[in-house]
């Protein structure tokens, strides 16, 4: 590199990187969007890590040998601290059955797992949080599920099933439930645990394909709404018997997923419909169908925050469908009363533009942002990644009566709290802040609240990443960096493609600089003639005479102008074999297949010489690096100085000007050299078919023939030549390299035994004698001084792609084009490299705290959460007393700067409450466990604070505006939960289609206390049914139950006997009939039916009794064998046991969360003060202060220590002492201190 000659060095460090292109069909399902905010995507055997906000590829992971078929980010549902930091962990699986768990920032494989050698069908990390975070479940074909420890790579257990497993889905509400989609149906597993494999073979159900049911065979044209009516008749889709052969030929179910928005619901996707099942009845309760002319589905993603579905269609269109609220709005007349209660209806609320689908271009997958659920990314087979963002805009009203859909209303809350006056907010922060929750009859007022606006949703394309087109490619790097061009140098790589366009990439950023459509056929070669212009040539397919159309274009990058360099020539002539530009970029040689070569002047674009017919056929050609430009310049300079002397005035002060005038003249001269008369002498050598070497000299427009060197007997037909300094290298078709030392007049042959030498190129940089050699099966780097090989890469041995073209991009990095459609920039050792992300030189800064060091990430979080020591909130870390290396400070500041202006202004808004801030920061960090905790905490802290103000004992009679979304299930308010369950039974009742279903509905109604409806259902039993008598008696019993003592005690006795003899459900029913639901819950808990008991408590018991049941459940969740403390905390939050939650947080060492939670409780006045609580407050605040001290935020530590009262005195003294002496205790000591619990 020339930079060694100058005192300062220029930073042109090119990172090793991979430019990727089209995807392989096996990469179709390999894409995932993690809570960390990044997208991982498989491309052949590499994995791209993409930042969706700036649409940049920030890492490429290379280690797989086969195509990547699945990628999965690990979940972030645990409390983050120094010992369990924010980290980017990704699992990827390939077509050869290998799973790799990556540390994405460093690009290193954390562990590798291999069981069989077939493609992994599906895999996912376990979500049950307090268990191990490292567990990974994978489907190894054909029929095994294996649980792995993703940290160590050890196998925990393995289980086989009778059918081939296609995919699986975890129940998001119950970690022990898992559903497998198999080739014949669905297998439900209810005893999934990480400690041992499932015991049974699971419950198998078969899917009768909806199209084979008789309802569909009716001609649809008979009635106008044929499709709808037919779909309503598809009642049963799930049978326990295996369907007959003609009924189901093939399970064409594309996908199965549990709905994360409500418990016990699942969706099945078929090409033309989505079925929503209620698993308690295993019964369809909703169908989303595509009309005849519509475009079939490929994939659907259910949302958690709202009952909504993102669907991907075969034309690449993404649609959003939102479940319609069942309450009719007041101004809406119910036209079809039956339809209203018939089923769940998902209305199409928004759709994005389709893409142009061709044979090679089709949509593969869509992923949505798991944190906010308002962005979707579409991956297309040609390597494009399209980022669609959902935007909500409010409209006045009633504008969508035309569409016939009930309106959608905006959400009331921002970050869990109703907005205050002039508070800044981000309406499009997440799906649940864009649209309000679905209403439930009997609980919600059907009219929108005062501040709810009607909203419309729109998709906007906010980012696009495109890949390279299909190979083959030809590569050429622009001229190397020198001392002269150092100020304006850009490392540009030109890539010629098969469709005739030339892509120019800037290799510092890896981004496409220009895409130029230059030719009409495949580009065969490119030669740069300056830093901003190049010549490229392309040849068409030969006709029957073997003649082609040659295109040789001159392209100027700055303007994009291209013109045909050879003018009118080029039609019907032999194909151009190669073009070679001389070192001074003065002359160009064009070599043809069966026609003598042409010599052109590059600067004027004129033909200097077309060689005679008897000119030898050229097999290889290279320009010599020697020329006489320097001696010419010296002569010119002498003449110039003589001129200057004659014209100089005799004044003394004039002489000081003289030298500068001359230097100006020289500058002008050197600039105009290329365009003006001066023509230096240059030479080139070439070989003919016999291996004879010719030497030709060109000066101006004279061409002289020089000496000839007879062929070397040991070489075959020469294929290529390279020349640098005093070394000339020849390569032949048999794999021999011949090194000539021109100074010492020595030659040395080396057989490489690798077959045809396709290309050889010397590395740039003065005195750099490395040589890059390309063969049909790979490439090698040679050191020509020592005449020995430095590194080698070979197809099948260390890589699985073929190399199509090579070049040097700097003095120590090479660039390879390969047939998997990628262009790789590699170190000279040619090991395929993932790079460290933190060494990347990105064009746009990326917000991703996970890229920081663990301590720095926690500092950033603490900095954003609370700055109570400042009057105003700042986004500048330098304004805070933060003792840390400047480099780390700089990285934190970069993260802060990369936040969007909206978010910055909201964070700096003094109106943002502590609870909103905690929620917003957990969203920014993609911290699942924080987000869940603060959502529930902020809701119930505010609810209990409100009810305390209005002197109500329980927060039941509240404005329904603010109940928790149903996706929180048992954590919701009882009234809301009850309403939801009643609505659900009503739907099940409408949909029931067999005696089994009717019986289940009657049972549910009895538990919910809806006795009249239950009696009606019981009396429906037909006389020929075996349980006719039993049901009739039950109906009589239900209607005659009065609260007289004797009958109650009898029933209670019968119920307890039933339970003791194993009829738990029946006994519980009887207890519910006589209003002894609390006893029923106790029995359920004794027999381990904890969730069922919690459900019953929510729907039947008053607040005090219900909270007893739920507290017992929380205790059970905390027990070591269950170990779901975080879930127990959420249950306690919903009961308002804030002190207990504070103590639990502190004892689990969640110091930051504990301190902020207690602070919020004190602020809202939901913790009364007594000695116990003061003690807790002191301990929590001191520990948080120590944590802040250990991560370097001293002011924060002082603030919290001073708030801790007595407990904080000692720490305050320590802090002020270190201040006084100016010594900062080392973080290692701090962490030891903070491990001691202060009581």
UniProtKB/Swiss-Prot annotation:
Principal subcellular localization: cytoplasm
Highest taxon of source: Eukaryota
Alphabetical GO biological process terms: cilium assembly; head development; heart development; intracellular protein transport; multicellular organism growth; neural crest cell migration; regulation of smoothened signaling pathway; vesicle tethering to Golgi
Disordered as annotated region, ranges: 1213-1239
Polar residues: compositionally biased ranges: 1215-1226
GO CC annotations on file: axoneme; ciliary basal body; cytoplasm; cytoplasmic vesicle; nucleus; trans-Golgi network
Deletion phenotype: Morpholino knockdown causes microphtalmia, microcephaly, melanocyte disorganization, curved body axis, motility defects and narrow trunk. Morphants also exhibit aberrant head cartilage formation and cranial-facial dysmorphology.
Keywords: Cell projection, Cytoplasm, Cytoplasmic vesicle, Cytoskeleton, Golgi apparatus, Nucleus, Phosphoprotein, Repeat, WD repeat
Cross-referenced InterPro entries: WD40/YVTN_repeat-like_dom_sf, WD40_repeat_dom_sf, WD40_rpt, WDR11
Annotated WD repeat ranges: 63-112, 115-158, 358-398, 476-515, 571-610, 713-750, 752-792, 798-836, 898-944
Keyword Phosphoprotein: yes
SMART domains hit by this protein: WD40
Localization per record: Cytoplasm, Cytoskeleton, Cilium basal body; Cytoplasm; Nucleus; Cytoplasm, Cytoskeleton, Cilium axoneme
Any matching Pfam family: TPR_WDR11
Signal peptide stretch: none
Complex and partners: Component of the complex WDR11.
Biological role: Involved in the Hedgehog (Hh) signaling pathway, is essential for normal ciliogenesis. Regulates the proteolytic processing of gli3 and cooperates with the transcription factor emx1 in the induction of downstream Hh pathway gene expression and gonadotropin-releasing hormone production. WDR11 complex facilitates the tethering of Adaptor protein-1 complex (AP-1)-derived vesicles.
Protein name: WD repeat-containing protein 11
Native organism: Danio rerio
Gene name of the record: wdr11
């Amino acid at each position: 590199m020339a930079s060694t000659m100058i005192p300062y060095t220029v930073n042109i460090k090119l990172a090793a990187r991979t430019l990727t292109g089209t995807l392989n069909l096996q990469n179709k399902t390999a894409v995932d969007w993690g809570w960390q905010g990044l997208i991982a995507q498989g491309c052949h055997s590499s994995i791209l890590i993409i930042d969706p906000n700036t649409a940049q590829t920030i890492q490429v992971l290379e280690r797989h040998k086969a195509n990547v078929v699945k990628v999965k980010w690990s979940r972030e549902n645990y409390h983050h601290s120094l010992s369990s930091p924010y980290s980017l962990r990704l699992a990827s699986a390939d077509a050869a059955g290998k799973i790799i768990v990556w540390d994405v920032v460093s690009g290193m494989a954390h562990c590798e797992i291999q069981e069989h050698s077939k493609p992994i069908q599906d895999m996912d990390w376990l979500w049950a949080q307090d268990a191990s975070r490292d567990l990974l479940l994978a489907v190894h074909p054909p029929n095994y599920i294996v649980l792995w420890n993703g940290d160590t790579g050890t196998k925990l257990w393995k289980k086989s099933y009778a059918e081939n497993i296609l995919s699986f889905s975890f129940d998001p509400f119950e970690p022990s439930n898992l559903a497998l989609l198999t080739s014949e149906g669905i297998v439900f597993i209810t005893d999934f645990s990480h400690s041992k494999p499932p015991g049974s073979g699971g419950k198998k159900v078969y899917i009768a394909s909806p199209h084979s049911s008789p309802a569909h065979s009716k001609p649809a044209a008979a009635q106008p709404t044929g499709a709808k009516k037919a779909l309503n008749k598809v009642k049963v889709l799930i049978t326990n018997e295996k369907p007959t052969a003609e009924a189901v030929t093939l399970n064409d179910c594309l996908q199965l997923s549990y709905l994360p928005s409500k418990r016990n619901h699942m969706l099945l996707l078929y090409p033309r419909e989505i079925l929503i099942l209620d698993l308690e009845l295993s019964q369809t309760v909703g169908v989303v169908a595509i009309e005849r002319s519509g475009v079939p589905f490929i994939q659907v993603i259910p949302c958690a925050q709202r009952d909504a579905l993102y669907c991907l269609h075969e034309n690449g269109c993404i649609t959003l469908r939102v479940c319609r609220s069942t309450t009719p709005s007041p101004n809406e007349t119910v036209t079809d009363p039956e339809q209203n209660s018939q089923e769940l209806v998902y209305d199409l609320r928004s759709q994005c533009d389709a893409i142009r689908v061709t044979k090679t271009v089709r949509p593969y997958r869509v992923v949505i942002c798991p944190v906010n659920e308002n962005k979707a990314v579409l991956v297309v087979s040609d390597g494009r990644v399209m980022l669609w963002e959902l935007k909500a805009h409010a409209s006045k009203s009633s504008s969508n009566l035309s569409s016939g859909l009930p309106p959608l209303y905006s959400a009331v809350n921002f970050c869990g709290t109703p907005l205050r006056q002039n508070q800044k907010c981000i309406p499009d922060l997440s799906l649940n802040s864009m649209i309000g929750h679905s209403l439930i009859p009997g609980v919600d007022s059907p009219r929108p609240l005062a501040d709810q606006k009607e909203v419309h949703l729109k998709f906007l394309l906010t980012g696009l990443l495109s890949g390279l087109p299909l190979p083959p490619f030809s590569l050429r790097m622009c001229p190397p960096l020198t001392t002269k061009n150092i100020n304006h140098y850009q490392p540009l790589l030109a890539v010629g493609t098969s469709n005739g366009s030339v892509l120019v990439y800037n290799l510092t950023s890896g981004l496409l600089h220009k895409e130029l459509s230059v030719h009409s056929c495949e580009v065969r070669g490119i030669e740069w003639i300056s830093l901003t212009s190049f010549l490229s040539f392309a040849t068409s397919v030969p006709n029957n005479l073997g003649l082609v159309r040659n295109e040789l274009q001159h392209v100027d990058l700055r303007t994009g102008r291209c013109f045909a360099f050879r003018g009118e020539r080029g039609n019907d002539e032999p194909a151009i074999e190669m073009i070679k530009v001389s070192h001074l970029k003065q002359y160009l040689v064009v070599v043809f297949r069966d026609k003598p070569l042409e010599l052109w002047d590059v600067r004027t674009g004129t033909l200097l010489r077309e060689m005679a017919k008897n000119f030898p056929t050229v097999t290889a050609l290279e320009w010599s690096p020697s020329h006489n430009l320097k001696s010419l310049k010296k002569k010119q300079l002498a003449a110039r100085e003589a001129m200057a002397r004659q014209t100089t005035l005799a004044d003394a002060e004039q002489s000081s000007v003289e030298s500068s005038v001359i230097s100006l003249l020289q500058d002008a001269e050197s600039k105009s050299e290329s365009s003006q008369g001066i023509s230096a002498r240059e030479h080139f050598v070439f070989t003919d078919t016999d291996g004879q070497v010719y030497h030709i000299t060109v000066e101006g427009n004279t061409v002289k023939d020089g000496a000839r060197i007879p062929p070397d007997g040991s070489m075959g037909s020469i294929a290529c030549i390279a020349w640098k300094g005093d070394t000339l290298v020849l390569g032949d078709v048999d794999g021999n390299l011949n090194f000539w030392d021109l100074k010492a007049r020595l030659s040395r042959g080396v057989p490489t035994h690798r077959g045809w030498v396709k290309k050889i190129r010397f590395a740039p940089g003065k005195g750099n004698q490395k040589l890059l050699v390309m063969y049909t099966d790979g490439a090698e780097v040679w050191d020509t001084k020592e005449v020995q090989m430095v590194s080698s890469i070979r197809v099948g041995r260390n890589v699985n792609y073929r190399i199509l073209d090579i070049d040097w991009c700097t003095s120590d990095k090479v660039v390879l084009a390969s047939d998997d459609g990628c262009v790789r920039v590699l170190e000279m050792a040619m090991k395929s490299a993932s790079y460290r992300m933190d060494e990347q030189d990105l064009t746009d800064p990326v917000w991703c705290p996970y890229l920081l060091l663990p301590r720095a990430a926690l500092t950033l979080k603490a900095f954003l959460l609370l700055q109570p020591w400042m009057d105003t909130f700042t986004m500048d870390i330098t304004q805070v007393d933060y003792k840390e290396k400047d480099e780390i400070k700089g990285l934190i500041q970069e993260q802060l700067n990369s936040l969007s202006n909206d978010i910055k202004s909201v964070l700096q808004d003094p109106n943002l409450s502590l609870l909103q801030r905690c929620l917003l920061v957990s969203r920014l960090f993609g911290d699942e466990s924080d987000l869940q905790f603060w959502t529930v905490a902020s809701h119930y802290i505010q609810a209990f604070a409100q009810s305390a103000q209005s002197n109500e004992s329980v927060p039941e009679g509240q404005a329904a505006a603010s109940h928790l979304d149903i996706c929180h299930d048992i954590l919701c308010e009882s009234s809301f939960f009850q309403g939801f369950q009643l609505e659900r039974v009503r739907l099940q009742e409408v949909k029931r289609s067999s005696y089994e279903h009717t019986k289940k509905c009657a049972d549910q109604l009895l538990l919910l206390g809806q006795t009249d409806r239950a009696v009606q259902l019981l009396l429906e039993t037909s006389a020929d049914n075996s349980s006719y008598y039993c049901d009739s008696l039950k109906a009589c019993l239900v209607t005659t139950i009065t609260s007289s003592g004797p009958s109650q005690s009898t029933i209670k006795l019968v119920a307890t006997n039933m339970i003791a003899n194993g009829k738990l459900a029946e006994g519980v029913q009887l207890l519910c009939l006589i209003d002894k639901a609390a006893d029923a819950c106790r029995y359920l808990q004794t027999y381990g039916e904890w969730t069922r008991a919690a459900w019953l408590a929510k729907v039947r018991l008053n607040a005090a009794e219900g909270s007893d049941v739920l507290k017992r459940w929380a205790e059970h969740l905390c027990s070591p064998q269950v170990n779901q403390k975080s879930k127990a905390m959420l249950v306690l939050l919903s009961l308002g046991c804030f002190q207990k939650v504070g103590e639990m947080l502190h004892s689990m060492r969640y110091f930051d969360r504990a301190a902020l939670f207690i602070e919020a409780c004190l602020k809202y006045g939901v913790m009364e003060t007594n000695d116990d609580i003061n003690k807790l407050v002191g301990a929590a605040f001191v520990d948080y202060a120590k944590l802040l001290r250990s991560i370097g935020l001293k002011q924060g530590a002082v603030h919290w220590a001073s708030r801790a009262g007595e407990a904080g005195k000692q720490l305050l003294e320590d802090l002020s002492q270190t201040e006084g002496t100016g010594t900062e205790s080392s973080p290692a000591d701090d962490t030891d201190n903070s491990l001691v619990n202060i009581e």
